[in-house]
């Protein structure tokens, strides 16, 4: 017990020092030129490509440990890096580099009758703490996005991706050095100890301005319950697709299979399929067969079970489950009203899609469902900052304060007011 207490003290002391250094780095970073930040990001991307072999070797260690632990295949997919994924990671950083620098942007401006000129201007948030689990690419995305927005960042990756994340972080540090920016602007917690998470949630004596958790329900719940600083919550992606009677069948089949099976382990993967009861004969069998043929397990409501014998019966637990695997729950609903009721009952407010040709159905879907991302005639797998033209994302925020949807460069800023006068005094 005494050893544990001493160990926690050591971790807390280390984290406080990391916080102090991050806060110190945030000051010059907030005023760094757009050109210097661009140079750092381009250099980071180049180093990542150059060190592909080192990153893959580190990832192999993480994969070996994960397989020995007996984790699910979907987890392995999220953890796995390949040459192609590393190239994509570098391309993502380059895309972030080419975004317009948000810092200093005048969001709005106006003149008062007394002659005062008021501007609302974008500013960095300061120091951001990012806590994530198995995806090593978050290291690159989060580091690059925070830098572009003029923020320092403290990264705490999961123990499962520890070696991969450290190898990627070394590339980011090298890019900062090349551009002459503080290397402490992007720091990674060098231990897998869970006490480090607890320390970050305290705010590190005022060093951390906001926490971004990216991971499973238990991680996000812990952060929301214990954090003493603001949180951009990235909840589970319990995403729905509703196929209306007015939908084009071939389009519906293509979108449904892509939304579920393109990458089953990402938060934008569809987890529940809702089919308009009025068009069950037209859609049910073709859609379910397409999913099964693609290797997906379908868990169906009782009224769908007769369409394809042998399907597993869905329970209430299924409607509340983010599978992150080749599994989907499916049911018939009473048109758009039934779809809205189901989604508003079970959704995690992440992403929902409607496949329909009836404009009235689409309008009701968009106006009566309050999730962060709503799509019409498109796959839920477009729920991604890169696909939104943001260059990347730290996560998909499902709350309603400050940031919502993909958390990109713009969402990682705050604002201040600049007021210009000519000698005015208040009467």
Swiss-Prot record:
Matches recorded under InterPro entries: Ald_DH/histidinol_DH, Ald_DH_C, Ald_DH_N, Aldehyde_DH_dom, G-glutamylP_reductase_CS, Glu-5-SA_DH, GPR_dom
Known EC number: 1.2.1.41
Primary localisation category: cytoplasm
GO CC annotations, alphabetized: cytoplasm
Catalytic reactions of this protein: L-glutamate 5-semialdehyde + phosphate + NADP(+) = L-glutamyl 5-phosphate + NADPH + H(+)
Family named by the database record: Belongs to the gamma-glutamyl phosphate reductase family.
NCBIfam families on file: PRK00197.1, proA
Protein name: Gamma-glutamyl phosphate reductase
Lineage of source species: Bacteria, Pseudomonadati, Pseudomonadota, Alphaproteobacteria, Hyphomicrobiales
Protein encoded by which gene: proA
